[in-house]
Amino acid sequence: MPNIKIKAIDIYHPNHVIENDFYINHFQKKGRDIQHFLEVMGREKRYVIDKVEENGLTMALEATKRVLERAGMTGKDLDYIEFSTQVPETTFPINAMYVHAEIQADHDTIIKDSNANCAGMTVAVEQASRYMLANPHIHTALIVGSDYNSLIANPEQEITYANYGDAACAVILEKTDENTGFIDASYHTDSVFKDKINYPAHGLTKAVKGKSDVQAINWLPFDGNVALPPTYKMIDQLLARNGLSIKDIDACCFSQFALSNILKIQDHYQIDQEKIIYVGDTYAYTGTSSPFIALYEGIKSGRIKRGDNVLFWTIGSGFQIVAMLYQY
């Protein structure tokens, strides 16, 4: 029986770095002290686009070219391309069309864009893995996740403005006879917070017709801790149905949205520190690509090796949580 493995992974981020002092000073001028907030979120610096010629699409193109080079492949070797983003540079055509053109992929290559907000790239990899297992004609897939977060971050709200960074990540999935790769995934969706994080703030229709602001995300306060009990239940069920325990997990690549969330999950399961891959202090929160940038850095540092069981966990606005098991 075939399996789907991660053949290669690479990233791209802008060169421009902004450290915490900029945001501390920005909000001090508004009469707010965000130093404790930055500590809770685990922020130190972030990469932010500062060139007019850069955007979410250009970042994705660069990450794509890098991962193809790393894998020793060309666009002609790809059967499937999926672009995960919540900040698409265009909606007509889809962003994946530009990726297809840039790498000169074949005419029979399937292409699509997808959006599951911050859970997007994890969802895309999970769905592509299952599709590849079901379709005998699909042997390779490119999944690229890219969000130009700073473009729509709200300078009046530290939860986005001081918390987000810009980056792209690309992975190559490959069908293999090796006993490795995709294991399983589980979802939990509760739409209770559907009106708490909005962009455009009042919908596309009003934004296009000039009846509301389209410049930034509007984020209303809510208690994100409600996502933790279903997270624990979901992870427990996912491990149990695959004959695993938390001790069998070699590395954890979680959403980098908030260090506090990672620490709560770590404490709940008593996960060893060396298994927690944290990159939010360097990259801040990169949205859709977040858990996979953690994977990239874990591999790069030697903390994640071939054969390791990796647990992914992430959350999308609204909210939807996703946990995925992959043997790297």
Identify the function of each model-found stretch:
Residues I6-A8, F37, V67, L78-I81, ...:
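Buried hydrophobic positions in well-ordered alpha/beta secondary-structure cores of metabolic enzymes
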Residues I18, F92-P93, V125, I152-E156, ...:
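Short acidic, glycine/serine/threonine-rich loops at helix termini
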Residues Y12, S84-E89, A116-A119, G145-L151, ...:
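Acidic, glycine-rich active-site loops and adjacent beta-strand->loop/helix elements
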Residues M1-V52, Q157-N225, K233, Y328:
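Condensing-enzyme catalytic core mediating Claisen C-C bond formation in acyl metabolism
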Residues L133-A167:
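Flexible, glycine-rich active-site loops centered on histidine and acidic residues
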